[in-house]
């Protein structure tokens, strides 16, 4: 459940499992079921619409504000509004499963269904969300803290969600004939010694090498070439535009709706002109078509195949979702992350720490800020480091590794 960045790795994994002869059913928020089905996956709708929520007035307010407490309040309120319907839908899908795989937002429910069916549960994470001393909770703070405080931030987040959600969870458990849970899924799953697949690269976070086989860092789960071809997301004329000039800088905000598209397009165009580069702008979930500038050096696309297009670019500026970050780094692009919330701040700090990018908050977005952060990345040092990192990332076979872990859990 979540934005496309949350869903696409699951779709890639489901496709790989199906190619191995497994029957796979994926429960998704209703707004992304069509995307998954076009990619050849048996996707079923859950009673939640992430796009509607993010584009609602309340969703827009907390996205624009960047306040973590407001984010938590809205997330908890929206979760409580939809969770009973989501639980019902998930229960209908889980019967007869040999294994249940769940992402962070529905981990409580997914692990409960695995317990009900008496089958293994595997978590699928896009950032280090289990308590650890290396990194703080990506929700609670964007700061690097001493190890005890890093662990404490995870406990704070766990307890906040547990206080707000344990009654709904235990009502769900009772409907399945299970006893009440007395601790959050983080605590229960860690004690049970289960496996959490970390769908990000060890080359980005070498500090977590000590997590071992229970939390393997497999890398980014990417769509197969067949899935990318089936989706056919490149717009007509894009390849010709790319070939007609110098490699552009990519600008995109993915599933984060842009509140003032005309203003944002104008400041991107201004920044690109000052940088002396062409601009490829991915509209994502924002409606920018009515504001497209009449400028041959600026191209706005509603959809695009990131794996196919980004290697033709010179640098990337985006919101810092785990999927977008993995895609731009895999393409060898120095990357500026203009973060909105959650793990986006974390990935922004990561690219800066690795010397392959820079970061600032979306609330600070301006043409001047874009020029100041992007210009140094177009020089040799950051570009060379980004290319070297891409070479290391290319050696990972994340999807096959994840499939092997799942098959091993079922044996």
Please identify what each model-predicted range represents.
Residues 53-58, 131-138, 226-231, 310-312, ...:
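Short, charged, surface-exposed secondary-structure boundary motifs
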Residues 95-96, 192, 311-312:
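Alpha-helix C-terminal capping/helix-to-coil transition sites in glycosyltransferase folds
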Residues 32-34, 50-54, 123, 127-134, ...:
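Short gly/pro/ser/thr-enriched loop/turn and capping motifs at secondary-structure boundaries
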Residues 1-25, 31-40, 71, 100, ...:
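Nucleotide-activated sugar donor-binding and catalytic core shared by glycosyltransferases
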Residues 42, 46-99, 169:
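Phosphate/nucleotide-donor binding subsite
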Residues 14, 200-315:
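Donor-nucleotide binding loops and adjacent catalytic segments primarily
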Residues 23-29, 278-283:
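Short internal beta-strands
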Residues 82-151, 203-204:
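Conserved nucleotide-sugar donor-interacting segment of glycosyltransferase catalytic cores
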